[in-house]
Regions:
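Structured binding/interaction patches within domain cores
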Residues: 1-148
Length: 148
């Protein structure tokens, strides 16, 4: 329960201390922390799109339009494989990856983290790991200044 409360406190802090886009950037970096661990659960056809997300968020050499195009292709994959409304356990890795393909927050930061926290248990991650990764990314964001 302490991990759960710490997660909620961190999210509250993001909302209070960062702009919406800065908090979203922290969220994106948080999501990137899990990709190497779940990549094997993502169909190979979709893994190639991770380069677009990496290029957009880290290298700055991918356009918002290219990011959107990849996002649409991922959604079409979900739809064509009847995973759009399937139980999360069947599509959690793809849906988690899909979070990286929005170039800006499309809802408030709580909604993003709620969705993420709904997906992570289906991928085998408990609150303890979520808290650790969230603390790490927040520390890095503050230290490196990418979100401050």
């Amino acid at each position: 329960m302490a991990d759960e409360q710490r997660i909620l406190d961190i999210i509250d802090g993001l909302e209070e201390n960062f702009t919406e886009q800065e908090a979203y950037r922290i969220y994106i970096e948080f999501c990137f922390r899990f990709i190497p661990r779940i990549e094997h659960k993502i169909p190979e056809k979709l893994r190639a799109h991770l380069e677009a997300a990496e290029g957009y968020w880290h290298a700055g050499n991918v356009s918002p339009q290219a990011l959107e195009n990849a996002r649409v292709l991922i959604w079409k994959y979900l739809d064509s494989h009847n995973l759009t409304y399937a139980p999360l356990r069947k599509s959690a890795a793809i849906r988690f990856m899909h979070q990286l393909f929005w170039d800006k927050a499309n809802t408030d930061i709580w909604d993003h983290f709620d969705w993420c926290r709904e997906l992570l248990p289906h991928l085998g991650y408990k609150n303890h790991t979520v808290r650790q990764e969230l603390e790490y990314v927040l520390s890095e964001a503050t230290r490196e200044g990418f979100a401050a």
